[in-house]
Amino acid sequence: GGETLLTYLGQLRHRSLPDILPSEELLDEVRDYFTPFFGAETAGECADVLRRRRCLSTANHHHPAFEYMTVQDTILCDRWLRTQGETGAVVPFLSCANPRLDNNVYPRGMLVYDCTAPEGCLRLPFYPFKLRHACVAAVEGISPDMVDNALNRLRQETRRGSCSLRTADALERFCREVLLSDRVQRCGTLREQTTVINAMLSQRYFTDRAPQYLWMPMETLTARLLERDFRTEAALTGQLLFRRELRAALLQALDGVSGCWTGDTSGTHFFWGLDRRAALFPLRLRESVGAAALAGQNSLGEAVTV
């Protein structure tokens, strides 16, 4: 408790582990994901940081980064990388895009912190309440109409004294310059918009530098790597999923383990479906003679088999 953050970060050490699968494949997919958003040079620098440090934060949900713990975490990661000799111009993050819009980091809208306001914190939604169960990875992007509605709500809250004029002015400027920018609006989904929004946000964090915090949803990266593996018959992932005896042993070993399968009772599941409401639902492996399928029930009560 008596140390500065910089002193504490200087004591952190990361021990690189050997590759289970070729790391260059991951770096290729990182470059391919970020290039359309930021260009080949920035995407390449992001991959180079990962190659040099082999370490990044995976602690955050994929959402426009307004929530205070998210901002603190990303800044700390930035500072740690700089203690390791990086310039901090590009800081990569892996984030989880599967949470719902009603998650506690509030991907449904903006969390506004204002110490001069009566409540100290204000929520300004972009998405309607009826979409609260939708998955962040699957919803459409923040539209100009959504931004206008949020700004109207902000003006009402300002008149009520729930938000200071100074904070309201900063928020309106952010909405006009970032959320309504061509860079953000040409992205069709909230998942893509989040990658651009957070890079633009981080460039406003400091007065002496303008780093880009590059967020990549880990589900997108995982899907791309799985597609690579499935094209190679001998790949580890394909062997685990499609060789029946290996799959059975894996399911048995991991059933009930925290963070893994828990059978038909509760907890997490390895496979998920996504229905037309953009809601996630668990899919469970069902095996019969000579065949395997994934089965579940979506949020509409419909039986689904894959």
Feature locations, PLM:
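An acidic- and aromatic-residue-enriched active-site/binding cleft used to recognize and process polar
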Residues: T58-H62, F93-P99, P217-L221
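N-terminal catalytic cores of NTP/NDP-binding nucleotidyl/phosphoryl-transfer enzymes
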Residues: A40-T87, P92
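N-terminal regions that are enriched for targeting/export leaders
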Residues: G1-H63
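A short acidic (Asp/Glu
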Residues: F66-T74, P99-G109, L225-T232
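Structural alpha-beta junctions
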Residues: D78-V91, A117-G120, T207-Y213
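Extended, H/D-rich, highly charged conserved domains that either
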Residues: Q193-V304
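Internal, well-ordered alpha/beta segment that forms a basic, Gly-enriched binding/recognition surface
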Residues: L94-A199
